[in-house]
Structure formats: C-alpha cells, structure tokens
C-alpha cells in the first residue's frame, strides 16, 4: 500500500502520519502491525530521485534503527527530562508506547 501518488502524498495511507495519530482506525492499526512502523517512515526518502546518488554513512549511530532498540517499558521508565530529548516526545508517551505494543502483538 503506497501513500505516494502521482500528485503527492496521500496522508490517509502515509505511515508517518498514521504513527503520529492519537486515535487509529482498525485498518490503520493493521497496517502498522503489518509494516512494523512505530514512529515515522523513511520510504519517501528512499524513493526520492534526489537521494538516488546519496552516499551511505559508515557511522554506526546512523546505520542502526533506533526504533528497534526501543521498548514500551524503556520509554515508560524514562524520566520526563530524558523523554523530552527524543523527537517523538511532543506527541506524548502513550502514542509511541501503544505503537510499539501494537507492532509486537
């Protein structure tokens, strides 16, 4: 299921948009389980013709998937100050922890 159309992005099918929603439809929940998306999406970056010749980094920090290292329990255990350091913190803990639990069901 692609969110990329001939005229732009269909936000109703955009994984990044869906992961940021507080209330998801059963279809959106199923899509997140199927794709394993927890927060955001890099598909647009990967298919963009402007990025076709981009060099890959050897810096481990950028090569590893940060989301793969997260667990709902680790996020819940963070202090408010530590949680605030993450880009997704503006959305609140519940959205990200629910997404993680949904993917791991």
PLM regions with names:
Residues 1-16, 37-39, 43-62:
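Iron-sulfur cluster-binding cysteine motifs and their immediate structural context
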Residues 3-27, 65-73:
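Active-site-proximal loop/short-helix segments
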Residues 26-34:
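Short linker/helix segments within small regulatory modules
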Residues 36, 88:
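Conserved aromatic-histidine-acidic binding/catalytic patches
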Residues 68-87:
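Flexible internal linker/loop segments at domain or repeat junctions
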Residues 81, 89-105:
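Long, compositionally biased charged/polar accessory segments in the mid-to-C-terminal portions
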């Amino acid at each position: 299921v692609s969110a990329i159309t001939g005229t732009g992005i269909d936000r109703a099918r955009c994984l990044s948009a869906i992961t940021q929603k507080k209330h998801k439809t059963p279809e959106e929940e199923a899509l997140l389980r199927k794709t394993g998306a927890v927060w955001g999406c890099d598909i647009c970056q990967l298919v963009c013709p402007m990025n076709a010749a981009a060099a890959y980094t050897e810096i481990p920090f950028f090569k590893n998937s940060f989301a793969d290292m997260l667990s709902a329990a680790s996020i819940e255990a963070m202090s408010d100050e530590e949680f605030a350091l993450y880009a997704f913190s503006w959305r609140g803990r519940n959205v990200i922890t629910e997404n993680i639990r949904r993917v791991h069901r």
